[in-house]
Amino acid sequence: NSRRLAVYTVEFFKDKQELRGEEKAELLNRIRECLTEFEEGMVRMQENMGRIYFIAVWNKDTSKILCEFLKKRIVPGNGISFRMAAGIMVNSFSQIPRSRTSSERGLSYCFYLGENTCFDCSQRHMDKIIWSLDGEKLRYACIVKDVNVIMEIADDLLKTAVSDDFMDPYDLLKSAEGILHILMVNVRKNEDNSSERMKQMQYFRQLEECSYYDSFYKVFRQLLIELTSAGEQDLIKSRNPLFLDIFEYVN
């Protein structure tokens, strides 16, 4: 789909504090003026509740191009940096106020890569999981019904971020955390396992030790298998759709 739209949220910082006031306004004005560098309709910018959004026609180079574009707008040596998160644009932003439960028929995934997001998957209604999204940094989310679509864009963003130092490793870890949470709800065998959180933290420590993108996904894949308490072939035979999606992606 040549017109697939990705949504990037960007936060600017100075000396590890969120950029505000006149300095932020000047930077945003520079960015707006330079958007003409892009082909018409390829990238547009929105601001809402202090957060900056870029809606872009996505292809395999979009993340890198946008990162380079933003780097050029920042004056070297002035201490300004940015972090970027990515999602897929479906129809429009769905505002999700903090601590409000969001339930949607057919909702599979609802997250931005790189966001410091907490997934509370403990609530169930009939056979449908109700996702409760709670996190200080999560103000908006996109509804995604196809894991392969979000993984494709996630993969592109993360490779760009890791290889060019655009994303802090902590953000990469948080991206994995969301997927592990979802997997724990869908394929875990013992829902009353009191040691589950401890086990999860052990997984995160292993991921934290990975220095490179390839080693990260090698460990991540192994953790996914261990988490299900079954072997690959058993899981493939069970035809669990979530596992098959992730299995296909990490392979």
Please provide the spans of the model-predicted regions:
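Cytosolic nucleotide-utilizing catalytic cores of signal-transduction proteins
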Residues: 3-4, 11-23, 32-251
